[in-house]
UniProtKB/Swiss-Prot annotation:
Keyword check for Zinc: no
UniProt EC number: 2.8.1.10
The organism's place on the tree of life at top rank: Bacteria
InterPro entries: Aldolase_TIM (IPR013785), Thiazole_synthase_ThiG (IPR033983), ThiG (IPR008867)
Example of a GO biological process term: thiamine diphosphate biosynthetic process
Pfam families membership: ThiG
Listed name of the protein: Thiazole synthase
GO molecular function, one term: thiazole synthase activity
């Protein structure tokens, strides 16, 4: 089970809802992924105007936990305003804090992310900050009392996969809250690798919505995350420089 604050989930796949070709493909991809948490940018939909088409009117929202994010925020104050807007609409009190500090790489601003997380915790939100693979920043966020850490595998939408597995492993090893790898996942192999490192979950969007067949890719991501988690729990064999025979040699007769 994936436990975030007071919530428990069977699926360890968190799915973003942007960039799908149409609502039908989006719905089918969500269904086959079996994701229980769906994330979306509050700024990209008018959640108060029923006349405007959006994700929420097409989905049976009772089946999912919605994770609004603060994408578009440039500082802590903007992030808090967006989070409060989502809460006022009656959505889940869980919020993904996203404060971008660089427009080229879309990497998060560490100072503003810390500040926004602290402010939102004081407001009673369940806080999941998107961060880089900075080990120290992850620890500081954890010390604030956030409910999960969401380090990026690589820049948002890049599909580069996990570019710094060592730092991710350090973050996971020191974590006392769930670690959900977020951003940069490009393939099922990337998702499986994140889980094999010991991540508690994976959040992705473009890898599915931008695939040639989003529905098949959603299923592939589901299976790879399950396989990666099983592999982590099973425990891989140690790496060795020399070969070790898989069949025992003792008791074997030698034909001369």
């Amino acid at each position: 089970m994936l436990n975030i604050g007071p919530f428990s989930f069977h699926s360890r796949l968190l799915l973003g809802t942007g960039k799908f070709p149409d609502f039908d493909v989006q719905q089918k991809a969500i269904d086959v992924s079996e994701a229980e948490i769906l994330t979306f940018a509050v700024r990209r939909m008018d959640i108060f105007d029923a006349k405007q088409p959006n994700l929420l009117e097409k989905l049976d929202v009772k089946k999912y936990t919605l994770l609004p994010n603060t994408a578009g925020a440039k500082n802590a104050e903007e992030a808090v305003r967006i989070a409060k807007l989502a809460k006022a609409s009656g959505l889940c009190d869980m919020i993904k804090v996203e404060v971008i500090g660089d427009d080229r790489t879309l990497l998060p601003d560490p100072v503003e992310t810390l500040k926004a997380s602290e402010m939102l915790l004081e407001e009673g939100f369940i806080v999941l900050p998107y961060t880089s693979d900075d080990v120290v920043l992850a620890r500081k966020l954890q010390e604030l009392g956030v409910h999960a850490i969401m380090p990026g595998a690589s820049p948002i939408g890049s599909g580069l996969g996990i570019v710094n597995p060592l730092n991710l492993s350090f973050i996971i090893e020191q974590a006392t809250v769930p670690v959900i790898v977020d951003a940069g996942i490009g393939s099922p192999a990337d998702a499986a690798f994140a889980m094999e490192l010991g991540a508690d979950g994976v959040l992705l969007n473009t890898a599915v919505s931008g695939a040639k067949d989003p529905i098949k890719m959603a299923q592939a991501m589901k299976l790879s995350i399950e396989a990666g988690r099983l592999g982590f729990e099973a425990g891989r064999i140690a790496r060795k420089r020399c070969a070790t025979a898989s069949s025992p040699l003792e008791g074997m007769s030698v034909v001369e």
